[in-house]
Design a protein with these regions (language model features):
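C-terminal helical "lid" of AAA+/P-loop NTPase domains
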Residues: 233-239, 245-260, 299-302, 315, ...
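Sensor-1/coupling segment of RecA-like P-loop NTPase cores
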Residues: 137-139, 143-146, 152-160, 164-194
Length: 383
């Protein structure tokens, strides 16, 4: 995957437009790590790179304008940029004043601006991207935005981003996006723009298997002089299901309990760390997400865990909760909005966090819905 991404970067640097890329998968599969690794590949390339993390307290348009200022400033030193600088800067001023009025870096009156933005984010972001793309083309640069947690973008923002990328592709401009997010981003992109599937390469990031899983365990230990027996490796891969974050946490728990002089890790060392491994996951990785749910939402996810298999249908969840589908549909929507679950197909849902149903079983072994309130209060499985 990293090698393919490097080819995409090399190709766009040579002036050939590239499809943007969306990496999607469950929590803990290494999407952000991959995105960061691709970013590092741009260090020695003529690529202007911006990392955008979508979060409640981090404004998308503000992050776009901040990076755009840096990109335009850097390109402005090129002799070939002189015919573009004033026009692109003027467009950026208009965009900034409209969408980020609290930004005081551009104190400019309407009469001083050549460009007046429309107030339609899709049109205005497209104008900005096209202007920067043309400037990059003339100055020998490519522009790449890396967007993490892309599923949290508002639909209006995603529609604008897709429209801007689409226009840049039509004009064969060297500007592309690498995005990473949960599986629900596929449905969102299809919803906002029907042609999204032509604009993006969608690459699923899943659990590691075979040699990749072994490498994730063995290679970090090599600089420390450590090694694993084959039996220990098999046990770790089985216990973690190959999920990179789980491998990291289990190996960390193993190393914490090793004798300082020990270099070979065996099956007993792995077994001795398993309890600590699950305690760490339950108190952090899982609990952080569980605590964001309301009591009713918790009943919903416990009912999901009680289904015979996952993904499960919402009708099955309703049956377990002894209610109608219409009564629990709002909880489904809320949980999807919180990125706790996602729709895997027609009327089917699953958790976005690997093995989340097993965590719920550790909290409430019998998965009794009438016990959820006790779990909520910490009477079962807390700390």
């Amino acid at each position: 995957t990293l090698e393919r991404a490097e080819k995409y970067l090399n190709t766009i640097v040579l002036g050939y437009p590239q499809q943007s890329v969306i990496y999607y998968g469950l929590r803990g599969v290494g999407k952000t790590v991959l995105l960061n690794a691709i970013e590092c590949k741009t260090d020695d390339m003529p690529i202007l790179m911006g990392h955008i993390e979508i979060a409640e307290k981090r404004n998308f348009t503000q992050q776009i304008t901040n990076y755009s200022k840096k990109f335009i400033h850097k390109m402005s030193f090129k002799e070939t940029a002189k015919d573009f600088v004033s026009r692109v800067q003027d467009l950026l001023k208009a965009f900034t004043v409209t969408y980020n009025p609290e930004d005081q870096s551009f104190k400019v009156g309407m009469e001083e601006r050549e460009y007046i933005v429309t107030g339609d984010l899709s049109e205005d972001l497209t104008d900005l991207f096209v202007a920067m793309g043309k400037m990059a083309d003339k100055t020998g640069y490519a522009i790449c935005f890396f967007v993490d947690e892309i599923q949290y973008m508002k639909e209006e923002e995603i529609a604008a981003l897709v429209n801007a990328i689409h226009r840049c592709n039509q004009l064969r401009l060297p500007l592309m996006i690498f995005g990473a997010g949960l599986p629900k981003i596929l449905k969102t992109l299809g919803k906002v723009k029907s042609y999204s599937e032509r604009l993006f390469r969608f690459e699923e990031i899943d659990a590691l298997s075979g040699q990749d899983a072994k490498d994730a365990i063995v290679k970090p230990a090599e600089p420390l002089g450590g090694s694993y027996t084959e039996e220990a490796l098999r046990w770790i891969i089985s216990e973690t299901q190959g999920y990179p974050y789980f491998i990291q946490e289990l190996c960390s728990a193993i190393w914490e309990h090793l004798n300082p002089e020990q270099t070979v890790i065996g099956i007993d060392d792995v077994k001795g760390a398993v309890l600590k491994f699950y305690e760490n996951l339950d108190r952090g990785f899982y609990r952080l997400r569980y605590d964001r749910c309301t009591p009713k939402e918790k009943m919903f996810i416990f009912a999901m865990a009680k289904c015979e298999k996952l993904p499960c249908s919402i009708s099955n969840v309703a049956k377990i909760m002894e209610t109608e589908v219409s009564s629990i549909s709002p909880y489904r929507a809320q949980l999807i909005n919180k990125s706790m679950i996602y729709a895997t197909g027609y009327a089917e849902i699953d958790f976005t966090v690997p093995e989340f149903d097993q965590f719920l079983k550790r909290l409430n072994p019998e998965l009794q819905l009438d016990e959820v309130e006790k779990v909520q209060k910490g009477d079962a499985g807390d700390e």
